[in-house]
Amino acid sequence: YAAAGADCLSVLTETTYFKGELKDLIQVVQDQPSWTRPLPCIRKDFMVHPYQVLEAAQAGARCILIIVRGLTDEEIVPIHRSAKLAGLDTLFEVHDEAELERALRHNPDMVGVNNRNLSTFQIDLSFAERVIPHMPKSVLKVAESGIKTAEDAARMRAAGAHALLVGESLMREQNPAALMKALQHA
């Protein structure tokens, strides 16, 4: 992915549903010195405790994912504060305008709109098209999930996305480098 032009790597560390492990993040970070272009890594997990933030920093992550839907505002505060104290960026994940409003109360670095409904797992790119325009200019806007083609990427950029978080499409693609280039040039 680095050779194909990725700007960042999202590494799943959640064990129960996504079969990732913290050691996967550690391995990716440790392997990077051999790469021609090392990349920052996001710890992608259900962050529910500040201890997980410290684990992420210790493992070499540069950013954590905070899924707004899964946390109360009171639970977000110590996780976000711990990330800032550890020098990590935060990507707040939202799915609708109400979650965006909650995320913005915490002054996030980045906000990603998940096009996958976490209740039904259905994907609809119109979620990002609807939510991204409500984000302030100061926030880095990310479109997440369901981006499979250059047309999808162009659609997300037209909605105002600065970045795309693409996982499943690249994992299933026989030529992920070609897909990445197509998404980047859309």
Regions found by a protein language model. Give the residues of each.
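Glycine-enriched alpha-helix->loop->beta-strand junction motifs that scaffold or abut catalytic
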Residues: 5-8, 31-35, 58-64, 84-88, ...
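Alpha-helix-loop-beta-strand connector modules within alpha/beta enzyme cores
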Residues: 19-42, 46, 68-69, 75-93, ...
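Catalytic cores of alpha/beta
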Residues: 48-60, 95-107, 143, 147-166, ...
